[in-house]
Amino acid sequence: MSDLDIQIPTAFDPFAEANAGDSGAAAGSKDYVHVRIQQRNGRKSLTTVQGLKKEFSYNKILKDLKKEFCCNGTVVQDPELGQVIQLQGDQRKNVSNFLVQAGIVKKEHIKIHGF
């Protein structure tokens, strides 16, 4: 009999790309802002924004994002990733455009991940 290379599917980890490149560096030390989407139950999804500089007020940015896109959101403190902004729904393009127009980050420093 011959040995077959069988790949067993595993759970999708949306933060795998970010953790693979990190060599113990803290969140925010890189120049990139990562905008990701996470699938929840059914058609529901969650948009996460990670990597903003620490001198920004995350709560003020979140307040403007919630008001602009009519969605709910929160700031989560993660031990590995630092502060992460979470928004309901697929807001990846909206968030990236908002961050560029507000002058928070340059367009070439935003990485959009997801489907």
Curated annotation (Swiss-Prot):
Keywords: Initiation factor, Protein biosynthesis, Translation regulation. Expressed in all tissues examined. PROSITE patterns: SUI1. GO terms for biological process: regulation of translation. InterPro entries: SUI1, SUI1_dom_sf, SUI1_euk. One of its GO terms (molecular function) is translation initiation factor activity. Probably involved in translation. Belongs to the SUI1 family. This is Protein translation factor SUI1 homolog. It comes from Oryza sativa subsp. indica (Rice).
